[in-house]
Amino acid sequence: MEVKIEQVNRKFISNSNYVFRKILNSEDCLGIIKNFIEAILDIKIKEIELNPYLKQKENYLPREENFGIADVRIHTYENEEMNVGIQFIDGIYVQTKMLMYYSQIHLNQLEYGDNREFAKTITINLLDFNYFSSKGCKKTIRIKTNEGDVRLEEIEMISIELPKFRCYDNDDLTEIEQWLQYLKGCDENTLEKIKSQNKYIKKLDTLAEKYWLEEKME
């Protein structure tokens, strides 16, 4: 399969998972994560909390397992409880990385130590290249398994191929269009429109600018 590489928003192209993780893994940024997940999954979140696994383990994981931006537990207004993981994937072993990441986020629940029941897990996988043959930029992958008469939990993974995203009216963007256009990268005029429409993207962009400024100063 031919993999066509295109650049994501340049604020995040250098080790995107690491940069996003440094910026977003704090209580102050939960609103940003919440807004992103609501836009991608088309849900309304009542409660959201960071799961501590990434922060606690990132220095001890092998490089091939040290991926992911955020690992959160959410409660929706429809009384659903689930874990959501978000990661960028590079162009190598894409399907393997998607499955490994899903497994990591789902099994992270063993680390909580607060007697919570296992909940459904969904992962959001961001690709800055074309990988699947489908034309749409967003793809939902579900894997159903059965063991005898017992139906095991459905695996659900979302993939978003940013280069496939197209928007033809930058003056009236939906929330998911705002996020995908921002992550894909856009001209300054479009960026300013997006930031005027979405305060969470505006905050993330400010934090990204601050991050790179501090990196240069160090």
Feature locations, PLM:
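Elongated, amphipathic alpha-helical interaction scaffolds
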Residues: M1-E218
